[in-house]
Amino acid sequence: MLLCAQYILPITSDPIVGGAVLVRDGRICDIGKVEMLKLRYPDEESLDYGTAAIMPGLVDLHTHMENSIMRGIVHDVPYTTWLASVASLSTKVEVADWYDSAILGGLDALASGITCVADITATGAACTAAQKLGLRGVIYREVGVMDKRRIDFAMHSAENDIMHWSQEVDTDRITIGIAPAPIYMCHPAVFGKVSELATRDDLPVAMHLAGSRE
């Protein structure tokens, strides 16, 4: 299939005006001027998007798709007030709601041109959403516990989730990782445990390195 448009944005090279992209079996096989590709592949079916731009999908490097239903509920307040409000509202959310919320977040991403996400989740809802919607990305299992006595249990639960999530997703598109929660939600020992697990199982790690001074 030749996908044609007024603009092709390869990103790694200059834009192509009046260009086309050859896609076969879900892979980009060629790119160039429409006329050139139609001569090169005369029997190829084509689809012309007209006055549009074809470009690689955008990447969202930090998202929480399962929290999408919280948008607009609490806003224009100090960070700590917002955080406490979201935490309180979260206790009223059913398991199925988290999955619906993650689907909503994934649809919002796709509508914005985002095709790859780095999502941090404690529920696993983002795994289901990414799998169903065809998103690419890294889904990080969040671990946050303040009580030192509960760290081993929290890590064991996270390890089990990571194993199960890895079996449920298309590993050609989705990678499972681990993420310690922000420092104000974690006992310091959690970071060491996360590092040990990530090193042992070769897991990607996401961390909140900055936040509000509050």
PLM feature spans:
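N-terminal metal-binding scaffold of metallo-dependent hydrolase/deaminase domains
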Residues: 1-40, 52
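Divalent metal-coordination and catalytic microenvironments
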Residues: 6, 21, 26, 51, ...
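Short, glycine/acidic-enriched loop or turn micro-motifs at the edges of active sites
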Residues: 33, 63-65, 122, 211
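Divalent metal-binding segments
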Residues: 50, 77-122, 180-190
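Hydrophobic "anchor" residues on beta-strands that sit immediately upstream
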Residues: 58, 115, 204
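Active-site gating loops and adjacent loop-to-helix segments of metal-dependent hydrolytic enzymes
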Residues: 69-100, 138-148, 159, 212-214
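Metal-coordinating catalytic core of metallo-dependent amide/deamination hydrolases
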Residues: 126-214
